[in-house]
């Protein structure tokens, strides 16, 4: 099949896996769940915040067995990290650093020009483009570089945030950031004193996002969570010896009494305690292929036993978790895009780094109305511009 709607109509399916570009996740998932078909959806769950909330609520309503494809959630080392936090090994956590070496595709570059003459034989471009704006077949978007353009992808944060932020979000039980702000470097320079232009339709080559969370039941302290991509990394903690490189991807959870460091997916987790030299405790490096297989198998097993069964409740990234996690990730993208808004229609000055205050219950950014367009990915067409509303 090339048209998922035809497949859902003709086949008697128990479940489907959805590994299409980000901008089509919601439509395909919704169509399947409305027919009672269970879904496994790649990360991020959706292209924007409101789609993630919609799918989460629909899964509950229709009693659908769900799983998002952040396979590290089923890594046994994550249970160990959660126990370290629960047992108070590093005290109250106050700061979390998360980072990735992405992008490994084009970002910060202009959208390629459409050229229908280059469309591969047999490709249905209209079906691939789905709900996004259709300018005609555009070389370079399919099959990979769509990730770097806002109409189709969600950039480095969308691609890796659910793999990396998954670890601290679950361990600390923090699901509703009240503040998000972002800054985007303007490099490289294309000529003397002339920075490269910023393209509205392209995700930036790097970003720095700060989330703030209130104390939770699992961690009685406010937390600042920092996301970095495009080569940005946190300072190397003194407690970690120089021979242990924190790497190009990872998580640092810093508490009163020490820190926890892990790689992508929560693998290679290590516990450090202030005043104690070296690693106090560490996990066995997981075979990520085995973890991924288990993550998918758990979803199949839960389908067999049914919604609400013990196996369903043991799923590590059903939409009750994956939905809020994806919302957090996608709020970071809203902050990134908002920082690149002009202060007014006639201004060449960007808003820049601005704290966005978020009402999670109502899915509204309360202090910059123009930022709300990025929760639904609608184009902002009003000529009015007010920096504070």
List each model region and its residues.
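Short, solvent-exposed turn/loop segments enriched in Gly/Ser/Thr/Pro and often Arg
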Residues: 1, 19-25, 45-47, 52, ...
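Beta-loop-alpha module in the N-terminal Rossmann-like domain of NAD(P)-dependent dehydrogenases
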Residues: 1-54
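Extracytoplasmic/secreted proteins, especially bacterial periplasmic and envelope-associated proteins
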Residues: 3, 24-27, 50, 54, ...
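Structural recognition of the beta-strand scaffold that forms the well-ordered cores
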Residues: 17-18, 40-41, 47, 66-68, ...
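A contiguous active-site-proximal alpha/beta segment in oxidoreductase catalytic domains
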Residues: 38-40, 45-122, 127
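Glycine-rich, aromatic-lined ligand/substrate-binding cores of catalytic
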Residues: 121-307, 315-318, 324-335, 340, ...
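A cross-kingdom feature marking charged/low-complexity
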Residues: 361-379
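Conserved small/polar residues in nucleotide/adenosyl-binding loops
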Residues: 380-387
């Amino acid at each position: 099949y090339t048209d998922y709607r035809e497949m859902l109509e003709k086949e008697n399916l128990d479940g489907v896996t959805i590994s299409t570009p980000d901008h089509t996740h919601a439509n395909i998932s919704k169509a399947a769940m409305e027919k009672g078909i269970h879904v496994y959806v790649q990360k991020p769950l959706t292209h924007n915040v409101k789609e993630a909330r919609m799918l989460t609520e629909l899964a509950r309503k229709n009693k659908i067995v769900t799983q998002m494809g952040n396979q590290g959630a089923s890594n046994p080392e994550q249970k160990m990290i959660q126990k370290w936090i629960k047992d108070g090994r590093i005290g109250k956590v106050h700061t979390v650093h998360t980072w990735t070496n992405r992008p490994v595709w084009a970002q910060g570059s202009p959208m390629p020009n459409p050229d229908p003459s280059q469309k591969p034989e047999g490709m249905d471009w209209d079906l691939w483009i789905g709900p996004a704006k259709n300018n005609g077949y555009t070389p370079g978007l399919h099959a990979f570089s769509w990730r770097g353009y806002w109409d189709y992808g969600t950039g480095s944060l969308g691609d890796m945030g659910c793999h990396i932020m998954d670890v601290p979000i679950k361990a600390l039980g923090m699901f509703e950031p009240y503040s998000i702000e972002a800054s985007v470097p303007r490099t490289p320079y294309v000529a003397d004193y002339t920075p490269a232009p910023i393209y509205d339709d392209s995700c930036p080559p790097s970003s720095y996002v700060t989330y703030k969370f209130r104390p939770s039941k699992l961690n009685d302290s406010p937390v600042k969570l920092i996301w970095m991509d495009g080569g940005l990394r946190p300072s190397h903690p003194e407690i970690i010896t120089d021979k242990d490189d924190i790497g190009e991807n990872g998580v640092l959870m810093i508490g009163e009494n020490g820190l926890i460091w892990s790689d992508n997916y929560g693998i290679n987790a290590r516990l450090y305690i202030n005043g104690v030299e070296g690693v106090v405790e560490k996990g066995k490096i997981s075979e990520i292929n085995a973890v991924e297989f288990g993550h998918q198998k758990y979803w199949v097993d839960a389908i067999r036993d049914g919604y609400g069964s013990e196996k369903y409740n043991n799923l590590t990234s059903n939409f009750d978790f994956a939905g809020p996690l994806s919302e957090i990730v996608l709020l970071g993208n809203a902050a990134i895009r908002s920082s690149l808004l002009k202060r007014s229609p006639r201004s060449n000055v960007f808003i820049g780094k601005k704290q966005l205050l978020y009402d999670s219950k109502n899915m509204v950014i309360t202090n910059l109305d123009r930022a709300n367009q990025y929760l639904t990915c609608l184009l902002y067409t009003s000529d009015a511009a007010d920096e504070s509303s």
